[in-house]
Amino acid sequence: MATFSQKPAEVVKKWVLIDAEGLVVGRLASLVANRLRGKHKATFTPHVDDGDNVIIINADKVVLTGKKYTDKKYYWHTGHPGGIKERTARQILEGRFPERVLEKAIERMIPRGPLGRRQMKNLRVYAGPNHQHEAQQPEVLDVAALNRKNKGNA
C-alpha cells in the first residue's frame, strides 16, 4: 500500500466562520493556522494547499493574556538607516487596523514560502461583526467550546 498523496484537483475546501470575541490570540491563531494548512484533515499533504477558507469576525475584541496587551512590541523597518519602528499590541488594537494583531499571529505560524502565501490568501479577518461571505454559507466553528482556556478572562 503506497502512502496517500493528495492531488490539487481532489481538494475539497470548506468555509469556516469564527467569532473571535473574547478569545485568546495565540490559541485562536494556532487553531486557524492548522485549518489553513489542512492539518485537521486525514488527507493532509505538506506540498498541497488542502486547507479550508477561514473567516474571522470581531478580531478587534480578541484577548491577550498576561501583560502582552501593554508590553508586547511589533517591530518593522522602514528600509532607511536607523529606521526601526515599534508599536505595542495596545496601540495596534486601538488603532485603525486592529485585525492585524491576529493576522500577524496566524501568518507567523504558517511556513514562509509560496505555499504559505497562498494559504494566507484563504484567510479573511474583519474587525467588526459583519463580513461579505454569506453566499459561501460558512460553517460556524465555536472555538470557545473546544477548550476552556480558549476564552480570555477580559
UniProtKB/Swiss-Prot annotation:
Keyword Ribosomal protein: yes
GO BP term, example: translation
One of the record's GO cellular component terms: cytosolic large ribosomal subunit
Keywords, comma-separated and alphabetical: Ribonucleoprotein, Ribosomal protein
Cross-referenced SUPFAM superfamilies: Ribosomal protein L13
GO molecular function, a single term: structural constituent of ribosome
Pfam family, one: Ribosomal_L13
Superkingdom of origin organism: Bacteria
InterPro entries attached to this UniProt entry: Ribosomal_uL13, Ribosomal_uL13_bac-type, Ribosomal_uL13_sf
Residue spans crossing the bilayer: none
Family, similarity comment: Belongs to the universal ribosomal protein uL13 family.
Purpose: This protein is one of the early assembly proteins of the 50S ribosomal subunit, although it is not seen to bind rRNA by itself. It is important during the early stages of 50S assembly.
Subunit composition and interactions: Part of the 50S ribosomal subunit.
Protein name per its UniProtKB record: Large ribosomal subunit protein uL13
